[in-house]
Every structure is written in C-alpha cells, then in structure tokens.
Amino acid sequence: MDTSCVHMLLSLLALLQLVAAGSSPGPDAIPRGCPSHCHCELDGRMLLRVDCSDLGLSELPSNLSVFTSYLDLSMNNISQLPASLLHRLCFLEELRLAGNALTHIPKGAFTGLHSLKVLMLQNNQLRQVPEEALQNLRSLQSLRLDANHISYVPPSCFSGLHSLRHLWLDDNALTDVPVQAFRSLSALQAMTLALNKIHHIADYAFGNLSSLVVLHLHNNRIHSLGKKCFDGLHSLETLDLNYNNLDEFPTAIKTLSNLKELGFHSNNIRSIPERAFVGNPSLITIHFYDNPIQFVGVSAFQHLPELRTLTLNGASHITEFPHLTGTATLESLTLTGAKISSLPQAVCDQLPNLQVLDLSYNLLEDLPSLSGCQKLQKIDLRHNEIYEIKGSTFQQLFNLRSLNLAWNKIAIIHPNAFSTLPSLIKLDLSSNLLSSFPVTGLHGLTHLKLTGNRALQSLIPSANFPELKIIEMPSAYQCCAFGGCENVYKISNQWNKDDGNSVDDLHKKDAGLFQVQDERDLEDFLLDFEEDLKALHSVQCSPSPGPFKPCEHLFGSWLIRIGVWTTAVLALSCNALVALTVFRTPLYISSIKLLIGVIAVVDILMGVSSAVLAAVDAFTFGRFAQHGAWWEDGIGCQIVGFLSIFASESSIFLLTLAALERGFSVKCSSKFEVKAPLFSLRAIVLLCVLLALTIATIPLLGGSKYNASPLCLPLPFGEPSTTGYMVALVLLNSLCFLIMTIAYTKLYCSLEKGELENLWDCSMVKHIALLLFANCILYCPVAFLSFSSLLNLTFISPDVIKFILLVIVPLPSCLNPLLYIVFNPHFKEDMGSLGKHTRFWMRSKHASLLSINSDDVEKRSCESTQALVSFTHASIAYDLPSTSGASPAYPMTESCHLSSVAFVPCL
C-alpha cells in the first residue's frame, strides 16, 4: 500500500473516531482503546495518553488505540519487544520503556512510529545499541539509553536520526567514544557520555557534531586527550571533564571559541600553563578545584572578558595571586586552600565588578584597601594569618552584606573599620585574639559571631544592634544583654507549670482569669506577656545563660547562699580550733590525734574555697554578668577549684587511714604488741596528701577544667572528659568508704560484747566510726549525681545540682570538727591542757619582767615548778592497755618524752 493510501486511511479513521465521540463522555468514563489496569486520559479531543507503568507487565498490551500519543510502559517486566507490534501507533510521540528487562531490540520494533519524538530505554539490560531498530526514526528528538550495560555502539545504528537533539549514553560500559556512530548526528545539541569507562578521547572524536552545545564526559577514566579531540565542536558551550584521571591541562580546548562553562575539577592536573584559555574568550565559568595544582601561570586567566566565575579549591602549592588583567567582568573569585600570603594593591582595579571574594584557608597576613571593589557583597577570609584590620581595608563597601574573618589572629581592629558598611548583615569574627570590638557602623547587623575570643570579656550593649537576630558570644554572660535570662526563666517556669494541666483545666483557668480581671488588669497582663515574648524571641544568643552561667547571682538562691556562708564560717573557725588544740597542746600527739589534726588542716582549705566563692557572690551580687568571664578565666577560680578537690580528696584519704589505724591500734592493744612508729604514719599521711595533690592537678593539665563554670568545679555533665573525671573520683572515693566500712565492721566483729568499753581509748574508735557514718551519708548525693549524668538522667534540677556541689560537698569540712568538739572528750582535755599551759606561760613571762627580791623569786619559781610537775604528772598516759594484771612490755619512766595521752572515760 503506497503512502497516499495510508494517509487516506488515517483520515478516515480519524473521522470515524470523531463521529463515535459524538457526545462528550463523562469525566469518569474510560476512553475507548484503553488497556485494562492502565490509566488513560484524553490528550485533546482525539489523542490518548496511556499510563501502564509499574503494573508488572511481561508483554506489551495488545489493544492499544491507534490514537495513542503517549505510552508509558516503564517499571515493568517486559523482556521482549516483538517486531511490528507498535506499527499502528502512527500518532505516538513519546514512548517510555525504562526500567524493564530488555536485552535486545529487534529490527522493525519501532517501524511505523513516524511521529515518535521521545524514546526512553534507560535502566534495561541492553549490551549494545540496537543496530537497526532505531534507524529512520526521522522525528526522534530525544533518546535515552543510559543506565544499561552498553559496551558497543554499531557504526550505523543512528543513521537516519536527522532530528535527534538529545542523546543519553551515560552510566554504561563504553571504553571508547563511538566516533563512526556519531557522524550521522549533525543536529545533536546535547550528549552525555558520563559514568562510563572511557580512557582516551581520540582526535576528531566529535568532528561532525557541529551543533553540539553541551557535552558531559565526567566520571570516566580519561587520562589523556588528543590534541585535536574537540575540533569540529564549533557550537560547544558547556564541557564537563570532572572526576577523571587527567594528568595534564586539556589544551585541546583552545579550539572551543564559544565555550562558556568549563569543568575539570577532581582530576590529577598539576599545572595550568600560561595563557591556558587564550582560545576561549567566551568563558563565563571555570571549575577546576580538587586538583593537586602546583603551578598556575601568571597570565593563565588574563583576557577572559566574559568570565564571571573562577573557582580554584585545594591548590595547595599556589603562593602568588594570579594576574587578572582583561578579566574585568569577574563576579565570583574563589581561591581556597592555597598558600597565598598577600594580595596586590591594585586587585580592585583589575576586578571592579567583583561581588564574591573567597580567599579562605590561605596564609594572608595583611590586606590592601578593597574600597575599589564597590560591588562586593560577600568576603570570606577565614582561616588566614591576618593580625590587624585597618581603617581603610573595607571602607565604602556600600553593598557588602557578608564578611567572614573567623579563625585568624586578629587582635586589632580600627574603631572605624566597619563604619561605612551600611548593608552589612553578617559578620563573623570568631576564634581570633580580640580584646575589644568596635560597634560603629554595625547597626544593621542581623548575624554576629564573636565566639572563641577569650580575651573579649566586656559586655556589648544591645542598643548598638537593633536588627540583630542571631549572635554568638565568647561567654554566656555577654548574652545577658541580649534577651535577659530572667525573662526566659520566668516564662519557661510558667509554661512548665501549665504542662501538667489538662486542656480542660487550662480553659477553666483562662476563663477564671478573664472573669476576675477587669479590662485594665487584662491589658497590663497582655502587655507584660508580650514584652516577655519579645525578650525571649528577639535575639538568639549563644551560649545562652543558665543556672551555671548566671546573669545576676552566682549562687542563685538564698538557701544556697546561707548554706555556703554557714559552711565556710564553721569550717574555718571549728577546724582552726581543732588544729590549735591538737598541735599546740603541750601533751604528746598520738597517731590518731595527728590524723585528726591533719584532717582539720585540709578542711580549713575547703572552708577557704567556700569562703572565696561566698565573697565573689557578695561582691558581684545582682551584676554577676559583668564579672563572670573575668572570674572564670582568672587564676582565682583555678585556685578555688584546686583547693576544693584537694581538700575533699585529702579528707577522704586521711579518714580512710584513720579507720585503718584504729583497727590496727585496737588489735595491737589487745595482743600487747608494739604499735607502728609515728614516723611510718607520717610517711603514709604524706603519701595521701601527694595522691590528693595529683588528683587535684589533673584538671589543670587539660580535659576537665576548673573554669568550665563559675563554681570552679568540674561539673558532672557536659564534655566526656569532665564526666569521666568525676565518675573516676566517685569510684575511687567509694572504694575508700568501702575499705573503711570493712575495716570497722571487722573491728567490731572481732571484739566480744562489752570489750569495746574496756578499751583504753574507745572514744577515738567511736569518733572515727561517727565520722565514717556522717561522711558516707553526705557522699551519697554526690555519687548519685555523677552516675546520673553518666546515664543521661536529666530529672535533677539545676538548683539541686548547685546545692549538692556548693553545700553538700563541703559540708563534711564543718561537720568533722563539730563532731570532734561536741562529742569527743579529748577535745575538752586538750582545751584544759592548752589553757593551763597558756596561763603558766603568761605567769612566767610576767615574772621575768618584774624586779623582785630573791625570796619572792625562789617562792614563785618553786610554785611554778610544783605546778608544772603536777600538770605533767596528771597528764601522763601510756600506749598500753590499763589492765590491773598486765605489766608493761618495756620499761617506763615518767619523762616528758613518754607518750602522754590522758585516760578518758569512754562515753
């Protein structure tokens, strides 16, 4: 049948279709010729769009309408495409066969598809381009063959495709460019050969593709290019050679006079020669970052009048800023990761249209005046070596909106450095060496970063930044001026209270509130609430203040304040009294008294640390934000934290030693054994002190730091090193308490009933037991706090944590001496002995100053001697049990060098 007959038949069929469609079908009616399970809709009045995608079909539907203009058979299981099955679809313009299992397409499969414009065959199992099936599809404009396994392209497979504009051959297994197959595609405009295995591009590989505009060759294995491989591509505007193995600069691009966008980043190119782009005057964008570039010709980027974007990242061997003469239209310049140490003074004369300047990760030390770059909108100079910002550096940059100077060594900024930047909204000066910050001209800022400048401790008034939305400061105290932590705390508390109520309760509460208040009260209430919300949401400042970074009061509550003052006063006074009675008494100091005296001395240090914190709270009362950063970073906070940890650990270690000493002493006394010499005990005491000193020094060496909070204590939460340090302390101290408990349990179990009361110094045994019990009870909250932070248990409120750290932790330092003063009879005896000794010393001193006769002198001397003998005789005691039948194990004489511990009844 000839062509004229075919056209007549088609016209007749169209007329019959129109007659059959005499009345419009309803919106839900299924058009005629629609296969079952497929979705069909009209395309105009005659043509039909058929969607049979993702139905699990294994073959083509047989009852397709001849007026089908769109057929989607993608995502099925079709493995064969019979010849001539689609030949009736002469109106078909788009055929989708993607995502099937096609391995071969026979000749004649697309015969009769004279109107076909789009053919999609991607995501199949094709191993070569169909040799004859695609020929003579004269209307075909777009062909997708990507994501197959194609390794061979027959030379004549594309013959007759005179209208083909777009060809996808990416994500296949091609090893070479199919030069012969492309010779018939003179109308081709865009082609991608990306994601293949191409190693080399031969000369004239695209010689006949004179209309090609876009060519993608990225993600191949290309390591070399023919010197004339791009000859013939007279219309090429975009060339993508990214992610290949190129070792040399692609000099073949010199013939691409219309090239506008060039990408060859992520290769192995080590140098860019002089006048590298001399044949590409139309270049607008160049991307060649992530190459190990060691050399860039000074004139490489000259005379590119259309160049808009230049990006060079990771060129670590570039030390000189490139000359950009004749590239005056450059708008974006990115040269990062190099070793550029200076900029030419005339950089803005060469780049008057520059809008984005990114020179981050270089070695810039000084900056020229950039006032000539009037169009600059963004400057990124982070991670350089800049020390000073001069007044002329950024002058009159009226369009500058973003300035990043983070991670430099900036210590000096001219007071007017930012005074002529009216459009600046983002400024980043984080991680520098600033001690002051100029605010002139920054009233339009919305984002400000100053974090990492530890020397910048002064408060910055919020009135200088009326438009500010986000700010990052070196310390939380500087955020107190931007929002007020009191408002945040008040609103959050109110919301927390309401969280526990049901919706009905809240409605009732609101209704009652409105009924009780008159209009004036309601307006005042709403105004206050709006002010609170404004204060809460106006500025997002970080790090935000909180219970451990307070704005007004260090201690927060009066309960903590009174507790700290009470602890400090009692610890200082009572421990001083105990130490005085122990070390200043004329009597011999026994081993247990030595331990009690040393414990009193270290508890004085704990009292000193609490007293210093109390003094800081009093000095900064109501205005702690002004002094918080100074206090945290100062030596005073380090000393307070060191003394606190040292005193706490020393007290526990010495108490453990006292418990062991009592057990050993009772054992020796019951067996009439000689006790260990006092020298050995002193050595062990020194060892305990050195161990506590080592533990207290660890935070000073790094990791867990004392200045993490104004409380000057390693908090049991936050950084893992801090948590680990606190947990290690808890485990060590728990071990000490366990040893003490075992020692005393063994001691009591080894004694028969009533035997303890007969011991010569049972009051000291009971006293150490009382200290053990009290200290163990007080340490339980500390241990629980540390382990709860380790387990991420967050139900403990900050006020409770502060109370434990500030009151419970130092409480043993005042409780230990109080227990000794109130309950231990040795204290009364020591006080009496100290009083007698003091009175005797005063009388002796008074007598030496008077001039009296010899009789009076002899009389007074005799009385004094009698008093001394009487006193010494009354104070003699022995380190052996006072049993009637036992004789001393060694000779004893009443000498001042003998052990002198008074016998005291066991209470």
From Swiss-Prot:
CC per GO annotation: plasma membrane; trans-Golgi network membrane
Keyword Transmembrane helix: yes
Keyword annotations from UniProtKB, A to Z: Cell membrane, Disulfide bond, G-protein coupled receptor, Glycoprotein, Golgi apparatus, Leucine-rich repeat, Membrane, Receptor, Repeat, Signal, Transducer, Transmembrane, Transmembrane helix
Signal peptide: 1-21
LRR repeat spans: 67-88, 91-112, 115-136, 139-160, 163-184, 187-208, 211-232, 235-256, 258-279, 282-303, 306-325, 329-350, 353-374, 375-396, 399-420, 423-446
SS bond partners: C34-C40, C38-C52, C348-C373, C479-C541, C637-C712
Coiled coil: none
Domain LRRNT: 25-66
Tissues expressing the protein: Expressed in the intestinal epithelium (at protein level). Expressed in the gonads, the adrenal gland, and in the brain. In the central nervous system expression is restricted to the olfactory bulb. In the adrenal gland detected only in the neural-crest derived chromaffin cells of the medulla, but not in the cells of the adrenal cortex. In the gonads, the expression is high in Graafian follicle, but absent from primary and secondary follicles. In the intestine, exclusively expressed in cycling crypt base columnar cells.
Extracellular side: 22-561, 615-638, 704-723, 789-802
Transmembrane segments: 562-582, 594-614, 639-659, 683-703, 724-744, 768-788, 803-823
Subcellular localization: Cell membrane; Golgi apparatus, trans-Golgi network membrane
Other notes: LGR5 is used as a marker of adult tissue stem cells in the intestine, stomach, hair follicle, and mammary epithelium.
Homology family: Belongs to the G-protein coupled receptor 1 family.
Function: Receptor for R-spondins that potentiates the canonical Wnt signaling pathway and acts as a stem cell marker of the intestinal epithelium and the hair follicle. Upon binding to R-spondins (RSPO1, RSPO2, RSPO3 or RSPO4), associates with phosphorylated LRP6 and frizzled receptors that are activated by extracellular Wnt receptors, triggering the canonical Wnt signaling pathway to increase expression of target genes. In contrast to classical G-protein coupled receptors, does not activate heterotrimeric G-proteins to transduce the signal.
Quaternary data: Identified in a complex composed of RNF43, LGR5 and RSPO1. Also interacts with other R-spondin ligands, including RSPO2, RSPO3 and RSPO4.
Protein name, entry field: Leucine-rich repeat-containing G-protein coupled receptor 5
Organism name: Mus musculus (Mouse)
Gene responsible for this protein: Lgr5
